[in-house]
């Protein structure tokens, strides 16, 4: 009986979803998977170029550089809040590189809420974590994923990327 319970538990653990399950596209339109970052933490951020929080791109890049051995920052441009990401993927990429020197991975534009929510964000907004679940409230919400692809923390937009709250969790 114990062996059966162990087998069931292992089946559940191995079949539980993780961020590695989702098919994504880069801002250049190429297929990619977050699975390439297994073994490192991920900081997934919904971004926008015309938002009061847009200067966080600079801190996100600093975080990506300073903690490159521990975490990969991945930006997901989204136009869900006040039309603050109206540009094309090419325009978004150029804006981020020119104004903030962004070199961390960016996905193509996605929807992070509503009927057309991207599957990754549907998962992230409902996945158990010690902080909170539910719909994203604004641009630059952050999701910290562990080395095994599980959500471990979620931060609202006002939490800066280099805050102690985030850096201690790395």
Give the label of every model feature segment.
Residues 70-87, 103-114:
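Thiol-based oxidoreductase modules, predominantly thioredoxin-like and allied folds used
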Residues 3-13:
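Sec-dependent N-terminal signal peptides
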Residues 42-45, 72-76, 105-108, 144, ...:
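Structural recognition of the beta-strand scaffold that forms the well-ordered cores
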Residues 90-139:
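Short, internal strand/loop/helix patches
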Residues 38-42, 50, 54-79, 97-100:
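Conserved helix-turn-beta segment immediately C-terminal to the redox Cys motif
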Residues 11-35, 118-119:
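N-terminal "domain-start" segment that seeds a small globular fold
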Residues 119-122, 126-170:
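Thiol-/selenol-based redox modules, centered on thioredoxin-like
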């Amino acid at each position: 009986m114990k062996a059966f319970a162990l087998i069931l538990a292992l089946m559940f653990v191995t079949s539980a979803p993780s961020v590695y399950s989702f098919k994504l596209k880069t801002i250049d339109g190429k297929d990619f998977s977050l699975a390439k970052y297994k073994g490192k933490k991920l900081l997934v951020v919904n971004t926008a170029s015309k938002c009061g929080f847009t200067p966080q791109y600079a801190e996100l890049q600093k975080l990506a550089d300073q903690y490159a051995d521990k975490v990969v920052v991945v930006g997901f441009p989204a136009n869900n809040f006040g039309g603050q990401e109206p540009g094309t993927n090419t325009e978004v990429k150029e804006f981020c590189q020119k104004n903030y020197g962004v070199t961390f991975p960016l996905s193509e534009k996605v929807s992070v809420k509503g009927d057309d929510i991207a599957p990754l964000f549907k998962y992230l907004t409902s996945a158990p974590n010690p902080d909170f679940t539910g719909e994203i409230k604004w641009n630059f919400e952050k999701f910290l994923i562990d080395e095994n692809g599980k959500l471990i923390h979620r931060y609202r937009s006002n939490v800066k990327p280099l805050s102690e709250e985030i850096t201690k969790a790395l």
